[in-house]
């Protein structure tokens, strides 16, 4: 490997170059090693970080993964500035069309409700029109999951909260807690359901077919010497989640909801 026209005046530059050379050497020797800076949207990170991500790192001890919870917009900014090597977001996303994208998984969107949701046939499946849109707890503006729920149902301000309270949650756990303590309902991605207690799982309602779902993908600015690491990460997450998700069994029964 030939090095030319490098500025060695900076210790930081030298350190970065040494790390880059070590990473390339490891890949050439077929050893998965190196450092990846990864941004993940909060509605995904909580559910794959302690499972799929940890499992991947356990199998690849020479990989250093720096993970940050970030909004989609900040992930895009981080990729453009070089702060991030890759990001995990809800796809497709129009502002991210300039990036390469690898599919990770599709997961169903479900309703979490403190009360039984009435429907004409009194079965376990609900229609968007069955939802009392005045009792919905939402994530803060700019969150893709919020937008997806708004795209399923026409939502208005939650009438359960005090008139002098301006509240928008930043994470799914807060929404679950608000439903449990105050009432109302919210939307949960399928992976969040696995972390609920048995009692809480009884509050889960599925929509009628076609079931709404969201697509999650990994985006990156351009292929680099770190590409093999990203490819292995994508494969690891896909293989781990594929047998766990409803979409896998009958994909024809689902419709993807836009994150914008």
Residue ranges and their predicted role:
Residues 1-12:
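Single conserved hydrophobic/aromatic residue that forms the stacking wall/gate
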Residues 10-29, 233, 237, 244:
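Alpha-helical linker/hinge and terminal dimerization helices associated
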Residues 29-94, 169:
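Central regulatory/effector-binding core of bacterial HTH transcription factors
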Residues 48, 203-246:
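A late-sequence structural motif
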Residues 71-76, 80-83, 90, 142-204, ...:
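Hydrophobic hinge/microswitch elements
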Residues 96-102, 107, 124, 173-223:
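Beta-alpha-beta core module
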Residues 99-137:
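Flexible hinge/capping segments at coil-to-helix
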Residues 119-121, 134-157, 226-230, 234, ...:
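Secondary-structure junction motif
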């Amino acid at each position: 490997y030939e090095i030319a026209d490098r500025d060695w005046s900076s210790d930081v530059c030298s350190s970065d170059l040494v790390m880059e050379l070590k990473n390339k050497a490891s890949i050439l020797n077929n050893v998965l090693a190196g450092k990846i800076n990864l941004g993940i949207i909060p509605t995904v990170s909580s559910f794959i970080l302690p499972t799929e991500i940890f499992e991947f790192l356990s199998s690849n001890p020479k990989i250093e993964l720096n993970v940050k919870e970030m909004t989609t917009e900040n992930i895009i900014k981080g990729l453009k500035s070089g702060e991030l090597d890759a990001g995990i977001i809800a796809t497709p996303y129009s502002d991210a069309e300039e990036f390469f994208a690898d599919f990770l998984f599709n997961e169903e969107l479900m309703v979490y409700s403190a009360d039984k949701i009435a429907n004409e046939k009194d079965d376990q499946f609900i229609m968007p029109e069955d939802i009392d849109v005045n009792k919905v707890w939402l994530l803060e503006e700019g969150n893709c999951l919020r937008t997806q729920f708004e795209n399923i149902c026409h939502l208005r301000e939650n009438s359960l909260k005090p008139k002098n309270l301006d509240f928008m949650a930043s994470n799914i756990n807060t929404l679950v807690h608000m439903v449990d303590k105050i009432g109302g309902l919210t939307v949960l991605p399928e992976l969040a359901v696995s972390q609920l207690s048995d009692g809480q799982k009884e509050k889960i309602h599925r929509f009628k077919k076609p079931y709404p779902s969201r697509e999650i993908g990994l985006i990156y600015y351009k292929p680099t010497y770190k590409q093999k690491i990203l490819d292995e990460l994508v494969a690891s997450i896909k293989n781990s989640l594929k047998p766990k998700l409803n979409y896998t069994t009958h994909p024809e029964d689902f419709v993807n909801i836009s994150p914008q």
